C-alpha cells in the first residue's frame, strides 16, 4: 500500500522491552510483511504498524486518514511424520496389548505389534504456528493512534520412545519374558503449546533532532499467556486431554512495545523495536 516506487532497504534491530513473557518480534501473520521476509520493523504500512513497530504510525501519506485490518489470519504447519495418527495408532496397539496381558491371550503378537508402532513413533515431531490480528488505525499529523488485537500460538508435538521399552517388548514377543509388567513401559508423548493474546492502543509522534526527523511509538497493552504442557506415557495418551485444566496454565499482565524509526534517505529506513 506504500506509494514509493523505489526499493526500501531496511536495517532491523529488535529487542523485547517491558516484556511480561518474551515473544518474538514477528509473532504475527501479515501478508505484505511476510512477503518481504519479515522486515516489518522498518517497512510496515501504517495500518499494521502496531503489529511490528508502533513508530511507523507516522509513516502515512497526506491523504490517509483511516485504515482497518480485519482480520489478518495465517498459519504454518509442519507434520511430515503424521504425528496425530501415529500417536493414535500407538494408543490403539497399547490398548490391545493391555487387554492381551489381562486375558493372557495373544500376548506375544500384541507385544510385537506394539513394538512396531513404537518404532514408528520414535523421534517424530510436528510443529504449527497460528495467528490472527486486527488493527484500526487513525492517521493524522499530530498524534496518530491505533487499536490493536492480536493472538499468536505455537504448538509442538513429539514422541519419546525408550530403547528399554523396545527391548522389553521384543523379549515378550519372543517368549523370553512371560510374566509381563505393563508398568515397565515408560515411553511418552509430549505436547507443548503457547498462545499469547495482546490488546493494546498504539500512539506515535514525529520528532526532530539536529535536523533529522524520526518517530517514536509506544503500544501499552494487556497480555494473556496460555501455556499447555501435555506430558504422559503412551498408555495414558488421549488427544482430547491436550487442553485439559491439568496441563493448562494462564498468566496475565501488562507490558508495552516501544519502537522508533527514521528515514536516512529515500532508500534507507532504520527501525528499532
Q: Which ranges hold each PLM region?
A:
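Subset of outer-membrane beta-barrel
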Residues: 25-273
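Gram-negative bacterial Sec-dependent N-terminal signal peptides
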Residues: 1-24
Amino acid at each position: 500500500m506504500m506509494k514509493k516506487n523505489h526499493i526500501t532497504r531496511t536495517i532491523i534491530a529488535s529487542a523485547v522491552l517491558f516484556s511480561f513473557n518474551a515473544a518474538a518480534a514477528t509473532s504475527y501473520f501479515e501478508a505484505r510483511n511476510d512477503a518481504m521476509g519479515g522486515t516489518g520493523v522498518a517497512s510496515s504500512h501504517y495500518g499494521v504498524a502496531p503489529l511490528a513497530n508502533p513508530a511507523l504510525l507516522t509513516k502515512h501519506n497526506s491523504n490517509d486518514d483511516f485504515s482497518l485490518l480485519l482480520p489478518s489470519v495465517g498459519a504454518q504447519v509442519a507434520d511430515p511424520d503424521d504425528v496425530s495418527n501415529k500417536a493414535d495408532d500407538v494408543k490403539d496397539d497399547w490398548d490391545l496389548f493391555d487387554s492381551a496381558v489381562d486375558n493372557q491371550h495373544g500376548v506375544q503378537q500384541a507385544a510385537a505389534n506394539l513394538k512396531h508402532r513404537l518404532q514408528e513413533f520414535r523421534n517424530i515431531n510436528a510443529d504449527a504456528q497460528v495467528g490472527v490480528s486486527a488493527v484500526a488505525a487513525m492517521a493524522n499529523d499530530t498524534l496518530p493512534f491505533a487499536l490493536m488485537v492480536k493472538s499468536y500460538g505455537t504448538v509442538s508435538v513429539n514422541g519419546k520412545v525408550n530403547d528399554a521399552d523396545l527391548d522389553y517388548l521384543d523379549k515378550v514377543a519372543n517368549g523370553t519374558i512371560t510374566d509381563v509388567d505393563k508398568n515397565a513401559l515408560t515411553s511418552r508423548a509430549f505436547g507443548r503449546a503457547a498462545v499469547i493474546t495482546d490488546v493494546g492502543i498504539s500512539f506515535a509522534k514525529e520528532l526532530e533532532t539536529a535536523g533529522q526527523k524520526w518517530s517514536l511509538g509506544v503500544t501499552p497493552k494487556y497480555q494473556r499467556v496460555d501455556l499447555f504442557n501435555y506430558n504422559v506415557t503412551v498408555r495414558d495418551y488421549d488427544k482430547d486431554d491436550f487442553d485439559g485444566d491439568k496441563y493448562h496454565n494462564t498468566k496475565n499482565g501488562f507490558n508495552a512495545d516501544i519502537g522508533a524509526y527514521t528515514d536516512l534517505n529515500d532508500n534507507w529506513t532504520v527501525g528499532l523495536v
